[in-house]
Every structure is written in C-alpha cells, then in structure tokens.
Amino acid sequence: MNVFLSKSAEEKLLKLTEYLLEDWGSKAKKDFINKLTEKINQIALQPQSCPQSSAFKNLYKCVVTKQTTFYYRIVTNPKSIEI
C-alpha cells in the first residue's frame, strides 16, 4: 500500500532530523531514519499491525522509538496510508 506524509508530518520530520543531526550527530539521524523506514515498510505491508488509537477512531499509533511516535490513517480512495 502507498504511504505518504501529510504536509504537517513532513515539516515535523524535517525539524526532528535537523535536531538529531545538530544535537546528536549523523549516526543518530541515520539510525532514526532506518527505524522510521522499517516502520513505514511494516505498515505498508500490514496496515493494521499497529494498535488503534484509544483517543481517535480510525487512527493507528506506531512507536518508532521510546521518544518518537507517529499516527496514521488508512485512506480508502485511493487506497493508501497517510502519516
């Protein structure tokens, strides 16, 4: 299934990766991007593999690291996943 980032998610991801690079170095940024990519691949193959949000119906919660979580929804037309 196709996975795409909302405009807000793109902006937040850019800020996060800049922070990681500036404060923690290129290895931390690379490690985070690898973990994020694994999670995106996971939900692309198995969209309902993460738990549904208890606060919002139709949202799923995906934990990337202890400090980082993203929420996504499954879009039916066209069939895709929005982060």
Where are these regions (language model features)?
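Basic, Lys/Arg-enriched alpha-helical interface segments
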Residues: 2-59
